């Protein structure tokens, strides 16, 4: 969920600040970020939403990301302009699924026919091809909306919303200087609206 521009900004600055420190980057979604930190696969995770408090995990707020409903310009919901309440239920909704838990709660699902996808890249691809509609992080689809490849849907029952993003780490293995610097970088990005 963290916008790519923020990841790239932080990692370029990290490389300049800590040129001898190795880094391993995994891109995961939803609960898989938490799972990697809990299971000690990753020392530090950045993502969200993390609604529940997990014992032994520290959370540091690093901003928000806006989610907007979008579809391809030829999709019936895009062609309709402003829709009536319930219009989204009659169309395939593409939903990001939490691969870390088959019992994770759904978020923002109103469609009666859903296609569940494991990553935002495949969801983005299918949205652009008109296969369904769904929520996406606004920074990820901004250029597509500006260039007319996707349409920000005006749906009566759905409005855009933001999710909170956090840096997380285990309290028994707090980040060292490089990890602490990276958390501070992500937090400072959110202060300037990056």
Task: Give the positions of each predicted feature.
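Central regulatory/effector-binding core of bacterial HTH transcription factors
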Residues: 1-53
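Conserved beta-strand core positions
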Residues: 21-23, 67, 165
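Structural motif
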Residues: 1, 50, 97-99, 171
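C-terminal regulatory
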Residues: 52, 56-131, 136-161, 180, ...
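A bilobed periplasmic-binding-protein/Venus flytrap-type ligand-binding module shared by bacterial periplasmic
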Residues: 70-74, 164-175
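Short alpha-helical
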Residues: 2-5, 31-32, 121, 140, ...
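Structured beta->alpha junctions
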Residues: 29, 156-157, 171
């Amino acid at each position: 969920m963290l916008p790519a521009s923020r990841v790239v900004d932080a990692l370029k600055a990290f490389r300049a600040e800590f040129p001898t420190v190795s880094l391993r980057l995994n891109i995961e979604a939803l609960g898989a970020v938490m799972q990697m930190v809990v299971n000690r696969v990753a020392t530090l995770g950045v993502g969200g939403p993390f609604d529940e408090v997990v014992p032994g995990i520290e959370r540091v707020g690093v901003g928000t990301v806006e989610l907007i409903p979008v579809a391809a310009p030829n999709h019936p919901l895009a062609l309709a302009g402003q829709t009536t309440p319930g219009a989204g239920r009659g169309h395939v909704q593409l939903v990001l699924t939490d691969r870390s838990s088959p019992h994770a709660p759904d978020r923002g699902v109103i469609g009666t026919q859903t296609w569940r996808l494991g990553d935002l890249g495949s969801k983005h691809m299918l949205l652009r091809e008109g296969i369904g509609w769904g929520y996406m992080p606004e920074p990820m689809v901004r250029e597509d909306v500006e260039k007319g490849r996707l349409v920000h849907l005006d749906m009566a029952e759905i409005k855009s919303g933001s999710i909170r993003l956090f840096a997380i780490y285990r309290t028994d293995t707090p980040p060292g200087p490089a990890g602490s610097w990276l958390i501070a970088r992500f937090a400072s990005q959110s202060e300037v609206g990056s």
